[in-house]
Amino acid sequence: MMIEALGVTEAATRSALENHVRKLGLEKGVMIAKKDFKKTEKVSKPFENIKTAYSGVVELEVLTKDYDRLVFLVLNYAPSAIEVLEPKKISIDAGEAQGILNSLAELMHRFVGLTRGGIMVDTK
């Protein structure tokens, strides 16, 4: 799993990635087996109104208790890329499929809330 961040300073970028990875590792049914923070790079004009920023990447090897947990991580931690190494074949029962679909439905509802001028915030 690769996660990227863009920040206004090198320290802010690194800190944001470290906090994001820390929170991911605290999720139930998730274990981070390996983490590799890549060198933060200076980026010129990443956006029209920003002169410079810093791009950071962390590569993670993550173990999850089931596929539903992996989908949860993708939806809530927004990795740039995912590679499933094992198992070679995945089968899920109806209950797990339903959980995954409900997670997707919840995400869609959050997007709808954003497009109507509101934002749904997790206060935890």
Language model regions located:
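Long, contiguous binding/interaction regions
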Residues: M1-K124
